[in-house]
């Protein structure tokens, strides 16, 4: 289903986007895609820290773009001025059957000419940076989240450290309280940029068996060149 986001620079639009990302790591699917880049480039700057979920997503996509870029196609996302809520309520009018975007999810508002120009400039900069292939090593900090408070965190960490490949070295780790008795695993790793794609590592190892028995989601908290 295509997703339509509108005026994500307004307070109302950012709040809706924050609610939308509450249970999601990406705009669509289970890995970063062109949908994320479309929304990312529509934001002229990093969102305020009060938008916790948007900030988490924004920092994650920033890190991915600095590392290996975003290549997945996604499901299709638009940033436009037509407005409707993410979860339509009873008093909202149903879209006409012949409208092209009747299945779209719209986080409302309008985009100004200045915002469009800023988005275009940002898209050009991201596209240019994506073509640069950097060599060397990087230090990465991951947030690995369990399914619930009953998840065995020792086995979760074991599943993470069992991922072995050329150019990957696991480092220090700690458990950080999240709330409601749930803790997340923060773990450092050092990678050789030309050999390890963090996005692929998460998608291919953490979100597949047996690791996905313990891991609900994983986010990149920090990504720094060494």
Curated annotation (Swiss-Prot):
Pfam annotation, one family: EF1_GNE
Family indicated by similarity: Belongs to the EF-1-beta/EF-1-delta family.
Coiled coil (residue ranges): none
Region of interest called Disordered, as start-end residue ranges on this chain: 82-131
Protein biosynthesis as UniProt keyword: yes
Protein name: Elongation factor 1-delta 2
A GO-annotated cellular component: eukaryotic translation elongation factor 1 complex
PANTHER family per the UniProt record, alphabetical: EF-HAND AND COILED-COIL DOMAIN-CONTAINING FAMILY MEMBER, ELONGATION FACTOR 1-DELTA 2
Biased composition regions of type Acidic residues, renumbered to the chain: 97-113
Gene3D superfamilies in the record: 1.20.1050.130, 3.30.70.60
Residue ranges, compositional bias (Basic and acidic residues): 114-124
Assembly: EF-1 is composed of 4 subunits: alpha, beta (1B-alpha=beta'), delta (1B-beta), and gamma (1B-gamma).
Lineage of the species this protein comes from: Eukaryota, Viridiplantae, Streptophyta, Embryophyta, Tracheophyta
Residues in the signal sequence: none
Species per Swiss-Prot/TrEMBL record: Oryza sativa subsp. japonica
Alphabetic keyword roster: Elongation factor, Protein biosynthesis
Keyword Transmembrane helix: no
């Amino acid at each position: 289903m295509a997703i339509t986001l509108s005026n994500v620079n307004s307070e109302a639009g950012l709040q809706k986007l924050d609610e939308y990302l509450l249970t999601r790591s990406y705009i669509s699917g289970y890995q970063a895609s062109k949908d994320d880049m479309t929304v990312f480039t529509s934001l002229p700057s990093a969102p305020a820290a009060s938008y916790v979920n948007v900030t988490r997503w924004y920092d994650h996509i920033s890190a991915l773009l600095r590392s290996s870029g975003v290549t997945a196609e996604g499901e299709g996302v638009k940033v436009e001025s037509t407005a409707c809520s993410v979860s339509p309520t009873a008093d909202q009018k149903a879209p006409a059957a012949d409208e092209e975007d009747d299945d779209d999810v719209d986080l409302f508002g309008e985009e100004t000419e200045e915002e469009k120009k800023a988005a275009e400039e940002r898209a050009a900069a991201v596209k240019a940076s994506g073509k640069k292939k950097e060599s060397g090593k990087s230090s990465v900090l991951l947030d690995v989240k369990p399914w619930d408070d009953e998840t065995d965190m020792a086995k979760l960490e074991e599943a993470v450290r069992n991922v072995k490949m050329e150019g990957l070295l696991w480092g220090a780790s700690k458990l950080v309280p999240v709330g409601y008795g749930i803790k997340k695993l923060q773990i450092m790793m050092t990678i050789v940029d030309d050999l390890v794609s963090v996005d692929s590592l998460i998608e291919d190892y953490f979100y597949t068996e047996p690791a996905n028995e313990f891991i609900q989601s994983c986010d990149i908290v920090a990504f720094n060149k060494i």
